[in-house]
Amino acid sequence: MKTNQLKLGLNFFSRFTRYLKPVTNPFRPPDNKKPVSSSSTKFVLSFDGGGVRGLAAAVFLKALEKETGFPISKHFDLFMGVSAGGLSASYLAFNQTSAEELEAFWSVDNLNLSMKRTFWDKALYFNNKPKYSNAPREALLKKHFSESFMDESAKPLALLAYDIERRTPLLMSSYGERRYRVFEAVMASSAAPLFYPTVKMESGEWLIDGGVVDNNPSLIAYVEAKKLFGADRIKVLSIGSGVNKKRIDGSASADWGPMGWLKNDVLGLLLESQMDHELLMALIREDYLRINSPMHSINADMDDSSDSNLKMIRYMGEMWWSQFGDDVKKFLEI
C-alpha cells in the first residue's frame, strides 16, 4: 500500500515540478552564470513555512554555529525556503549572515512591526480584508535587503511562491533566468492568504505564499540541487516548524461553515502535508535529515508573537538541538 502511495506521490511531483521552470527575462545580465558543477557532495538547507515558529529554526542553527565555530552559510551550498522559511533562507544565504543575527531578526519588535495593525486594518479585517498590511514588513525587509536582486546572493537561494493568475507554483531563485528583488521574493513567498495581501511583483506576477502548494520544499530543493550542481551526492537538511497534534472533532467539523473552518485553523491543515518527507525518505533516506517535533504548549496560530508563545517556540528549537545535534554533525560530516 505504501509503495503505491509513493508511486502516486512521485507521479504528482513530476507533474508539479513542470511548473517550476523559470521564465526568460530579457533584462537579465548576460554575464550572470550558474555555479560551476561538481561531482563532490553538496549540502542543501531547506526551511518549512510556519509563521512566528520560524524562530525555532534560528535557535537550532545558532546552536550548530556555536558548536562548529562557523556561520551556517559555510556548511551549505543551496538555501531553499517557503513562507517564513523563505525569510530565514534569504537572511542566511544573501549576505552569509549568522544564525545568531537571524535569531535577532525574529525579535518581538520586528515581529510586531511586520504584523502591525491600525484601527482601519482591524476594521477592514472584519470586512473580509487581509489581517495585516504589506507596508510595515516591506519597510522591514528593505532595511535589510535594500533593493538588491536575488542573483546578488552570496550563496544559491531559491524561494517558492504561487502565481494566482496562472494557477501555478513559481520558483524564484538567484540562478534562474528571471530576476527578482529579494525583499519582493520574501514578501511573495510569505503572503499567506487571510494574513497578507497578494503581492504584485515588479515583473508583473501576482503571488501568494508558496506554502499553499508545498509547505515543506525539501524535495524541490533536492531536485534544484541536482540540476544546479550535477553532484554525485546531494544531502538535504530539512527544518520544520513544529507538528500540531491538537485533535480535531470530526463530528463537529461536519457542521462547520467558512467561519468554523477558519476558527479551527483550516490553513494550518492545508500546510501539514507529509508528502515531501515520505518521498525523500524513499529516494535518499541516508542523505536526508528532517528536524521537527510535535508542538508542546505552543499556539499553532502563525502570528502569535506573545512573550509566552515565543518562549515556548525558542524552547522547541533548543530541544531540537538536544535531540538532533549529534545527528546533524554526523550528517554534515563535521
Task: Annotate each PLM feature.
Residues 2, 6-16, 37-40, 197, ...:
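C-terminal helical/tail subdomains of lipid-metabolizing enzymes
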Residues 8-42, 103, 107:
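Non-catalytic, mobile gating and regulatory segments of ester bond hydrolases
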Residues 30-37, 68-73, 142-157, 226-230:
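Surface-exposed acidic, glycine-flexible loop patches that form ligand/cofactor-binding
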Residues 42-46, 51-141, 181-186:
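Patatin-like phospholipase
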Residues 44-47, 77-83, 157-161, 235-246, ...:
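Extended hydrophobic secondary-structure segments that form protein cores and membrane-embedded regions
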Residues 130-155, 249-279:
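Surface cap/lid and interfacial helix-loop subdomains adjacent to catalytic sites
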Residues 151-227, 259:
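Active-site gating loop/helix substructures
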